[in-house]
């Protein structure tokens, strides 16, 4: 998270996990005691994934039982970059499921959101990853039910500022008003489309895909609370 800081509220940190596998590092958010929501591109490669839940000084390491990417996801399209990760064992007691937002309409330009992830603080420097950071960003451009672009409220995407980066993918996006889960971090780029951090942060809003999330969670044996 470029320009991010440790989350001011510990309750936010208790929802979030670090996902590692092969040479990959991503973020995820618990939505049930043994189920994590993340970005599909984080878990597409063959390999063994593990989740690290941080409670106290030592992380609890959890094995992954199965992964369910959204069936329409493709790295070459704007299809939903979402996946569910089923844990082989329940997570640490300190990890709590996040509550979904009940918001059913796309955000408006200027709406504020909290993004969080374990990604790098400096693009290209993997040594700066692995620490949970958060930032407050605002909606810009044309918010829709498929994609949401967030920017630093001071820079507005015109120059580098706060924003998600490598390793933040799959991390949660919370409504700044009620702290409810409204989206998942998917990508970052400059306004010209170049993959540069600190300009535009791309988000997948969850309202459109809520039915898929609920149905898939039940198939994985982790029904979500109403």
Where are these regions (language model features)?
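N-terminal activation segment of mature serine protease catalytic domains
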Residues: 1-22, 27
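Extracellular/periplasmic catalytic domains that process cell-envelope and extracellular macromolecules
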Residues: 8-12, 30-31, 44, 61, ...
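Hydrophobic residues in beta-strands and at strand termini
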Residues: 19-21, 30, 38, 53, ...
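Short loop/turn motifs at secondary-structure junctions and domain boundaries
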Residues: 19-21, 156-157, 162-166
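Sec/Tat-exported extracytoplasmic proteins
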Residues: 20-21, 38-41, 46, 71, ...
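C-terminal subregion of chymotrypsin/trypsin-like serine protease catalytic domains
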Residues: 25, 30-43, 134-139, 169, ...
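Catalytic-histidine neighborhood of serine endopeptidases
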Residues: 25, 32-33, 37-76, 108, ...
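Chymotrypsin/trypsin-fold serine protease catalytic domain
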Residues: 67, 79-161, 199-200, 206-213
């Amino acid at each position: 998270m470029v320009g991010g800081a440790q989350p001011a509220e510990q309750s936010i940190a208790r929802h979030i996990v670090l996902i590692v596998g092969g040479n990959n590092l991503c973020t995820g958010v618990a939505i049930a005691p043994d189920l994590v929501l993340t970005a599909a591109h984080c878990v597409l490669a063959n390999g063994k994934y593990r989740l690290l839940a941080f409670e106290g000084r030592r992380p609890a390491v959890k094995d992954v039982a199965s992964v369910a990417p959204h069936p329409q996801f493709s790295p070459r399209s704007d299809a939903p970059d979402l996946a569910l990760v089923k844990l082989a064992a329940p997570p640490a007691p300190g990890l709590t499921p996040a509550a979904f937002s009940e918001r059913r309409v796309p955000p408006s330009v200027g709406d504020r959101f909290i993004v969080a992830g374990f990604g790098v603080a400096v693009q290209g420097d993997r040594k700066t990853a692995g620490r949970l950071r958060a930032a407050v960003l605002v909606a810009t451009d044309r918010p829709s039910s498929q994609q949401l672009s967030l920017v630093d409220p001071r820079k507005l995407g015109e120059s580098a500022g706060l924003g998600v980066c490598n390793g933040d993918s799959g991390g949660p996006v919370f409504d700044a008003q009620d702290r409810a889960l409204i989206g998942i971090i998917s990508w970052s780029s400059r306004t010209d489309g170049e993959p540069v951090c600190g300009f535009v942060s791309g988000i997948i809003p969850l309202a459109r895909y809520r039915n898929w999330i609920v149905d898939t969670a039940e198939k994985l044996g982790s029904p979500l609370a109403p």
